[in-house]
């Protein structure tokens, strides 16, 4: 990782500039999806052995990308359009993290049906499911950390869907804390504070960003204020300036 940005997009810039690149963004995302789907069916053997190392390496073999985008699943169309804009305007290929994390549950479902389901009781074994979940999450989080380490730039797509101020009282007292309820976003932002900065081999600056989705009623809050404070703030006018330099 060479640099990291905290990007807060505006509705105006999205509607007038980025949105028209959604079609290409969809194509990029779909290509990544096919790679992920292929990966899911390849490394679970008939004798019950899961090749975690090969699975992890294949899962992120498509991540030799210029940019990693971290985002909320609620912003997926905006992020796809943003990825299309980066490709069309700068020739940069961005990896959208939810392309992989969105299939985390598919992988777990496949494993659980094969190894955790009791056909007689027609139920899943609770302890085995905890075991498989911990393994899959560990494999994917490790792979993501390696991916982030090998990427020049990370862009956090910061919207109200990803970050919220903790409460009104803290705002009044000037003790703002930026909170996320997504464990994957928390993991990614935390990693940006721990990864060593690497000088790129070429002079151009690239961007990258990863994200995650939270779809359950259980909400766990993570304070990511420190991680965001260490990022470079990025706004629409910076994007326009970069585009004009092309």
What is the predicted function of each stretch?
Residues 1-23, 191-246:
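C-terminal tail/extension regions appended to the core domain(s) of diverse proteins
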